[in-house]
Amino acid sequence: MRGRVSPLMLLLGILVLASVSATQAKSPYRKTENPCAQRCLQSCQQEPDDLKQKACESRCTKLEYDPRCVYDTGATNQRHPPGERTRGRQPGDYDDDRRQPRREEGGRWGPAEPREREREEDWRQPREDWRRPSHQQPRKIRPEGREGEQEWGTPGSEVREETSRNNPFYFPSRRFSTRYGNQNGRIRVLQRFDQRSKQFQNLQNHRIVQIEARPNTLVLPKHADADNILVIQQGQATVTVANGNNRKSFNLDEGHALRIPSGFISYILNRHDNQNLRVAKISMPVNTPGQFEDFFPASSRDQSSYLQGFSRNTLEAAFNAEFNEIRRVLLEENAGGEQEERGQRRRSTRSSDNEGVIVKVSKEHVQELTKHAKSVSKKGSEEEDITNPINLRDGEPDLSNNFGRLFEVKPDKKNPQLQDLDMMLTCVEIKEGALMLPHFNSKAMVIVVVNKGTGNLELVAVRKEQQQRGRREQEWEEEEEDEEEEGSNREVRRYTARLKEGDVFIMPAAHPVAINASSELHLLGFGINAENNHRIFLAGDKDNVIDQIEKQAKDLAFPGSGEQVEKLIKNQRESHFVSARPQSQSPSSPEKEDQEEENQGGKGPLLSILKAFN
């Protein structure tokens, strides 16, 4: 009896097997070569309900080509979307970096309504006149993937390299967002520096703005709750600045700068018939740190007039006129009669593409707006007025040779426009194939805008050694909060970036920097905390701080003797700007030099900093 199976038990077993087979037939296990999606599909098999299981599998299928679904590095036969080379997300990768641009509407810049659209718009350069010539188009850069690479040197002196995507000091042009824009031009604002990295808290109240305008256009009058310094990067502009008692107009060309104090009304005219106007501006808000607002007296598609914010009684009392007249003249609402015809004629000249804060103007308007404008002399104005323009190329350059030159305007009594702001303006021109030698600023923190050309940046920093490589940027910033912990190991990091027109990078005080020009490179610098700042070079015939170190100290600090260090320094006969091509090597073989270095051993952190530039 014990060996016999009950017919009832046998029937129940058959029913269970049939049920399992039916379940597997309805929901077959789908295979995928993406390990991330594979694990998701496996988890779906635990769902008891068929509908929930199918919904789970549908979600997992979408992960197969999702860039957030990281492929395992050890997986074979990885599948990628056609034509795309996929890699894991690295520190510094932002969500907006993965967005794809939408189709441009009407071939013009749109208003800055949703911020996402602004970011997507910055992925591409504008069409027609705004597009660079084909020979100036920036190349698509593939990440070098050298993060964490151990460089040459003695144990404990390795140099870690961070490329453009992981470089907190580098702000590509796509990080600008468009505040106002139409087919006549656009005004863009760079993201806040302190939002990128907490080490830029001193720059919290400094914002970079770019203005681009087509020929014969006008940026409408406005004022802002921020002090501004603008610099003409390209083209010819007539800038008018006015307060309650005075008005000044200046004809500005490339290299001219002008301060617009907070609350002063200003408007910018591109008076050239064929050339686009480009202006770089640094804004320092006076109300809320890091935030500023523009106030327009006239309404446009992008911005309403601040006069509309006042009540009817206030406007009638302020202008001593009836509200209907105020509305017709200033607000263009419900106009009638002769005023309506005049408004229609004005609106006919301002088509839908011409509505906005940048408008097209006639040649007659250009002549009237430039009639009383003053030109800027090479020596600048002798009057001590903060609204007088500055000529960045005034006089002889501060540094100059066959490979480049540098002009600098310092915050002193000669330049009251900069003195109370404690700022300096720097203009650097590096010839193609030249190198601006490694150097640093003793006190100033410099915001650099790439005005023209292409090049490569190398910036050296000393950071707390990071045990786990490849963290997300948020975790990396949290790690920076503990940078000043005593006793923690420090490592030298090299931050690199490929520079192109419109990019911005930061030169913190005391951080060594070298700049290599792959084409003629023009840079514009806004220096913060510039009073008593000194530019200190680490190589070259003149202004070389290492050459000032005593021979005995050199002998203790470097692997070679003091005499060898001094002899090496004298090999470079140029100063400040040199050829980027390395000079001929000494007769001794590299193997012999490495052996001598190993025998000597590293003697100090200065050697590690110098190694970062190799």
Curated annotation (Swiss-Prot):
Glycosylation sites: 516
Acidic residues bias: start-end ranges: 475-486
Gene3D superfamilies the UniProt entry points to: Jelly Rolls (2.60.120.10)
Record keywords: Allergen, Glycoprotein, Signal
Keyword presence, Glycoprotein: yes
Annotated Cupin type-1 domain residues: 169-327, 390-566
Segments of skewed composition (Basic and acidic residues): 81-132, 464-474
Pfam families: Cupin_1
First and last residue of the signal peptide: 1-25
Residue numbers spanned by region Disordered: 72-177, 334-356, 372-397, 464-491, 572-614
Top-level taxonomic group: Eukaryota
SUPFAM superfamilies: RmlC-like cupins (SSF51182)
Similarity comment: family membership: Belongs to the 7S seed storage protein family.
Name used for this protein in its record: Allergen Ara h 1, clone P17
